[in-house]
Amino acid sequence: MHSLTTHKHVRGGDMTIRTRFAPSPTGLLHVGGARTALFNYLFARHHGGEYLLRIEDTDRARSTPEAVQVILDGLDWLGLSPDQEPVFQSTRETRHTEVAHSLLERGMAYRCFLSPEELQAQRDQAAADKRPLRINSPWRDRDLSEAPSGIAPVIRLRVPQEGETVVDDLVQGPVRVANAELDDMIILRSDGTPTYLHAVVVDDHDMAITHVIRGDDHLTNTFRQVQIFKALGWDLPRFAHIPLIHGADGAKLSKRHGAVSVLEFEREGFLPEALCNYLLRLGWGHGDAEILSRDEQVALFDLDGVGRAASRMDYAKLTHLNGVYLREADDQRLTTDLCRRLDLSPDSDASSRIRRLMPKLKERARTLVDLAESARFVIERPSGPKDAKAAALLSDEARGWLRALLPQLQATDFSAAAVDQALRAFAEEHGLKLGQIAQPLRVALTGGTTSPPIDATLEALGASEVTSRIEAV
């Protein structure tokens, strides 16, 4: 079990800001969760605080080590790894149970012996009355001497029935609910295991969390969790409920809209800094700057810039932004990624050729998948023209020109400048426009009609490879 503090951290007389990202390991890190993690990270960094990770793995059936690793890998890829080792909620069940029993001993909670049949009757009545279900337990005030045999009780919190609960949310503003609308929630199930709502409160307190930043789908939970904090006499954290991410059609984001998990975006060739930049600007505003470095994000981010309306995922805009980041990315870093995607040894000749071409290759690419595809000709000799347009360029006459050109190319040192000069001289000598020789040459070398500039392409491939490819046509 992780040893946790049970007090607010103090530094220089002031409370240290502590945030947490608390996902359930379901097998993927959703892009919405990634944005929540990013906001928690940036808020903590902006205020000189700490950003923690809690894995809410109390659902034993779904919470596998593999599912946990997906979350850890996704956060690591995004550059959002926590400041401390993750806390696993499942290891803290004893603590959760102790706190529940302390509430019971102080009269802030009670044992409830409602049978499954009695509970179902209340559900049926609520449905018939077309009203929200609110469990009314007679055991709130009944004497335990009347308890039936054969029913293992749950423990319910004794929620105030008068007044209202107000959450002064840092994004949504003041949100209130009449306490009469809240039922006495279960904090310990009949099998002795703690409920999610109860465990979260205990963990947030013990981890000294000062700010709970999460999706606004948790807002209704917050009213209930506030009751637990108050019953325990613990300081409340500040709450900030951020809007969810929807698809372009306004519906909840799902696979039908496109990639939804962080590792899908990685596979599809997005850079982590581009995805983070996009997610930050999705629902947070600060001036007109679209591209912000991580340091700039930390310096500028605060919750007052977060909007209340749901954001719509725009994959086209993300792809455009990714292209901007690609063009600014380090060439060796991109080459290393392409070697992985193309199953190349980083020390191979092909890797060196790709590295030389990278400044030109990345000019048109929008994703790393695009980039890898555009570099494929470096490692795979074309089996012929890729399409009809390319085939038309490689006419018998054009093949003759290429054979005539080859000795002139071989006479150069194969630098881009020398290749360019040789091509221009050949075109002028034969009364051709430069494109009339450059385009067939491009098809011969790459199989297609697009590539980096032809002089750079020849320089990267080298004399031997260029000779082999021209002779093959």
UniProtKB/Swiss-Prot annotation:
Q: Catalytic activity annotated for this protein?
A: tRNA(Glu) + L-glutamate + ATP = L-glutamyl-tRNA(Glu) + AMP + diphosphate
For this UniProt entry, the molecular function terms from Gene Ontology, in alphabetical order, are: ATP binding; glutamate-tRNA ligase activity; tRNA binding; zinc ion binding
Which residue ranges does the UniProt annotation give for the motif 'KMSKS' region? 252-256
Q: Where in the cell is it found?
A: Cytoplasm
| GO CC entries | cytosol
| Keyword terms of this UniProt record | Aminoacyl-tRNA synthetase, ATP-binding, Cytoplasm, Ligase, Nucleotide-binding, Protein biosynthesis
| Entry's EC annotation | 6.1.1.17
Extract one GO BP annotation from the record: glutamyl-tRNA aminoacylation
Where does the motif 'HIGH' region lie?
Answer: 23-33
Alphabetized Pfam families for the sequence:
Anticodon_2, tRNA-synt_1c
The UniProt entry's sequence similarity note says: Belongs to the class-I aminoacyl-tRNA synthetase family. Glutamate--tRNA ligase type 1 subfamily.
Q: What does this protein do?
A: Catalyzes the attachment of glutamate to tRNA(Glu) in a two-step reaction: glutamate is first activated by ATP to form Glu-AMP and then transferred to the acceptor end of tRNA(Glu).
Subunit info here reads:
Monomer.
Task: Please name the HAMAP family in this protein's record.
Answer: Glu_tRNA_synth_type1
Report the protein name in the record: Glutamate--tRNA ligase 1
Traced from the root, the source organism's taxonomic lineage reads: Bacteria, Pseudomonadati, Pseudomonadota, Alphaproteobacteria, Acetobacterales
